[in-house]
Amino acid sequence: ADQLARLRAEFQANRYLTEERRQNLARELSLNEAQIKIWFQNKRAKIKKASGVKNTLALY
């Protein structure tokens, strides 16, 4: 629960992480960098999907 709260707080502050920030978060939360990266990717995708934004490039 603390990990999730920390990830959400970080996401609120910045939707995209630098490599250094990702490494620090991984260390702080005892997760690996890939887990942090995927969590952020999924969170961005979820918000994009919920907002109804469509990828117009996919049509061509």
UniProtKB/Swiss-Prot annotation:
Keywords: Developmental protein, DNA-binding, Homeobox, Nucleus. The keyword Nucleus applies. Residues 1-41 bind DNA. It is found in: Nucleus. It comes from Myxine glutinosa. One of its GO terms (cellular component) is nucleus. Its main location: nucleus. CDD domains: homeodomain (cd00086). This is Homeobox protein engrailed-like A.
